[in-house]
Amino acid sequence: MTKQPEDWLDDVPGDDIEDEDDEIIWVSKSEIKRDAEELKRLGAEIVDLGKNALDKIPLDADLRAAIELAQRIKMEGRRRQLQLIGKMLRQRDVEPIRQALDKLKNRHNQQVVLFHKLENLRDRLIEQGDDAIAEVLNLWPDADRQQLRTLIRNAKKEKEGNKPPKSARQIFQYLRELAENEG
């Protein structure tokens, strides 16, 4: 028995199958280049980190070795090594690396903000005295009121006598210790 023309159409694969997973996503060449350039910048950012910060980022051994080599190389060789690091990053999941890098940056920003707040509080302590001490005691109940009063009195004398602000620095250090012990 021979197949009729209508029967052979049933054997053609893919006519009746509609699978969305097999859908091809078209990406422009420019977008691929932008992504590659972004990963190269990410690699350069990682290369610029110090050893302690680099330890906090999840890197495999090959990528870590390439980054350490790039840190030692100068000029044109460094550019080529950054290209290699970008290529290596394209083959890996970079989301954990980005998250760790953002965490490092954010920690630094939080520390800067905290220092500015402590500096402002120190300046208010020197200017306002007991009112600002009450604010400090509300923030940190275990703060030593007498030590703060002594440091403030000395800071005011140093300011009036145009002397170096040794006591003002001590107030800042004391406030920083209180903030660190709290969190």
From Swiss-Prot:
GO cellular component entries: cytosol
Location of the protein in the cell: Cytoplasm
Molecular function terms from GO: ribosome binding; rRNA binding
GO biological process: assembly of large subunit precursor of preribosome
Alphabetical UniProt keywords: Cytoplasm, Ribosome biogenesis, RNA-binding, rRNA-binding
Family, per entry: Belongs to the DarP family.
Protein's name in the database: Dual-action ribosomal maturation protein DarP
Biological function: Member of a network of 50S ribosomal subunit biogenesis factors which assembles along the 30S-50S interface, preventing incorrect 23S rRNA structures from forming. Promotes peptidyl transferase center (PTC) maturation.
InterPro entries xrefs: DarP, DarP_sf
Protein origin, superkingdom: Bacteria
HAMAP family: DarP
Taxon lineage: Bacteria, Pseudomonadati, Pseudomonadota, Gammaproteobacteria, Enterobacterales
Gene responsible for this protein: darP
